[in-house]
UniProtKB/Swiss-Prot annotation:
The gene is tal. GO terms for molecular function: transaldolase activity. PROSITE patterns: TRANSALDOLASE_1, TRANSALDOLASE_2. Pfam families: TAL_FSA. The active site is at K132 (schiff-base intermediate with substrate). This is Transaldolase. InterPro entries: Aldolase_TIM (IPR013785), TAL/FSA (IPR001585), Transaldolase_1 (IPR004730), Transaldolase_AS (IPR018225). Coiled coil: none annotated. The lineage of its organism: Bacteria, Pseudomonadati, Pseudomonadota, Gammaproteobacteria, Vibrionales.
């Protein structure tokens, strides 16, 4: 019998959640996703030293100001890692905007355009890139602007139904609803483990997927942040799933039937009126888990971005 990873590929587009090119080459995913934490981790791999050196050289050619050099190096490093990943995946790379811009629509748009220009200057076309933004109201509005410019976006740190609905209404290309981090919160709060089928993260993504398909939204649903393969298999059939190398290996080693759990109903139900800012904030803030995890996620990405900047500054 074929492995569970092979069977999953037949139902869902498998994406690698890593900046490790060796791991990506091994599992042959369609796409790959990175974030500030993964870029920091990748930057500490010895084989990536030439990419850091090239990024520093680029930054020094752009400016004599050290602060600007650090910022430019970080951006170019993310792009350089993305370029290497695109040599081994046929699809797209997701590159994230600085998390400290999560509440700054204009700043996010400017940073996204800069990243896209860096890719374009290296010969990478827009159809191979997704710009990652936090699913704040401001991030969603930035994505709305960028999508109209032909820059596709991946809205991440998505924990509430309100975030998912607002993303669809803004016409974003793809969302990354988090599974494991939702489960973590409920596990800590309730002090118990969950069967995969009743995992709160799985339930959340299933609800979002069904809503999108009922109303005919084209936004791609890509489940993310998995803690075990049970969560992944409960979402078989989802548009895309982004999976860490260790869980890809578990799926590669596992046999047994993979059953399609999420099915596209191709619905055309009349859509509700788009949410206002006030409605979004009210609905999102009714979910204490989502409020806590969104803020926590932004903080943690910002911390890792800061660590990367310190590391780069020491090498300038």
């Amino acid at each position: 019998m074929s492995t569970k990873l092979e069977q999953l590929r037949a139902l869902t587009t498998v994406v690698a959640d890593t900046g490790d090119i060796e791991a990506i080459s091994k599992y042959q995913p369609e796409d790959a996703t990175t974030n500030p934490s993964l870029i920091l981790k990748a930057a500490q791999i010895a084989e990536y030293a030439p990419l850091i050196d090239a990024s520093i050289a680029y930054a020094k050619a752009q400016s004599n100001d050290k602060t600007q050099q650090v910022a430019d190096t970080c951006d170019m490093l993310a792009v350089n890692i993305g370029k290497e990943i695109l040599k081994v995946v046929p699809g797209r790379i997701s590159t994230e905007v600085d998390a400290r811009l999560s509440y700054d629509t204009e700043g996010s748009v400017i940073k996204a355009r800069q990243l896209i220009k860096m890719y374009n200057d290296a010969g990478i076309t827009n159809d191979r890139i997704l710009i990652k933004l936090a699913s704040t109201w401001e991030g969603i509005r930035a994505a709305e602007v960028l999508e109209k410019e032909g820059i596709n976006c991946n809205l991440t740190l998505l924990f509430s139904f309100a975030q998912a609905r607002a993303c669809a209404e803004a016409g974003v290309f793809l969302i990354s609803p988090f599974v494991g981090r939702i489960m973590d919160w409920y596990k800590a709060k309730e002090g118990r483990d969950f069967e995969s089928s009743e995992d709160p993260g799985v339930v959340s993504v299933t609800g979002i997927y069904d809503y999108y398909k009922t109303y005919g939204y084209n936004t791609v649903v890509m489940g993310a942040s998995f803690r075990n393969i049970g969560e992944i298999l409960e979402l078989a059939g989802c548009d895309r799933l982004t999976i860490s190398p260790n869980l890809l290996q578990e799926l590669e080693d596992a046999t047994g039937e993979v059953v399609e759990k999420l099915i596209d109903t191709n619905g055309t139900k009349e859509r509700p009126a788009a949410m206002t800012h006030a409605e979004f904030l009210w609905e999102h803030n009714q979910d204490p888990m989502a409020v806590e995890k969104l803020a926590d996620g932004i903080r943690n990405f910002a911390v890792d971005q800061g660590k990367l900047e310190v590391m780069i500054a020491e090498r300038l």
